């Protein structure tokens, strides 16, 4: 019996080409891939470091508003072929990122702590209290 295909990892630059479309040849290839991911014929694992790099690049370099960034990424995370151990955590973090002024990494940490019933060490009382995360100072 053949082994099921494992999801493949994707780099930030592929997702950027898909969202921004500033390199026509690469955009065409990235779009083709993402269409397969959308219909589930291809599976991708999008790690949190890639999401963080995407957000930073879209905010700082392309000056995309955070709500637009979150919406675009949440759309990608709704594709049938997006798989991975942290997909749920990242999706929750993106919703928090969209609705607050808290940076994505803190939203991700809060989402992970909440989903995995963990206590988070931080000096950032304000943000983690707003995200309703169990946290404590070291």
Predicted segments with their positions:
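Acidic catalytic patch
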Residues: 22, 45-49, 70-98
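Short, well-structured N-terminal submotif of metal-dependent ribonuclease cores
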Residues: 1-46, 61-71
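Acidic, PIN/NYN-like endoribonuclease modules and their adjacent C-terminal/linker elements
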Residues: 1-7, 110-138
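Histidine- and aromatic-rich ligand-binding microenvironments
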Residues: 11, 45-47, 102-103, 124-125, ...
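Residues that scaffold the ATP/ADP-binding catalytic core of kinase and kinase-like folds
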Residues: 17-19, 57, 131
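Alpha-helix capping/helix-boundary segments
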Residues: 14-15, 50, 89, 109, ...
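Short active-site oxyanion
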Residues: 40-44, 81, 115-119
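Short hydrophobic/aromatic patches on beta-strands that form ligand-binding or substrate-lining surfaces
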Residues: 54
């Amino acid at each position: 019996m053949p082994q099921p295909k494992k999801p493949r990892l994707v780099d930030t630059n592929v997702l950027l080409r898909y969202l921004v479309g500033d390199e026509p040849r690469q955009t065409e290839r990235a779009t083709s891939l993402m269409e397969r991911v959308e219909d589930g014929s291809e599976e991708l694992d999008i790690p949190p470091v890639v999401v963080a790099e995407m957000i930073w690049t879209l905010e700082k370099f392309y000056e995309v508003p955070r709500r637009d960034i979150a919406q675009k990424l949440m759309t990608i995370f709704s594709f049938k072929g997006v798989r991975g151990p942290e997909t749920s955590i990242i999706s929750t973090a993106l919703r928090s990122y969209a609705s607050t002024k808290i940076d994505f990494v803190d939203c991700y940490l809060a989402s992970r702590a909440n989903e995995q019933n963990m206590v988070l060490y931080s000096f950032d009382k304000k943000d983690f209290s707003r995200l309703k995360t169990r946290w404590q100072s070291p």
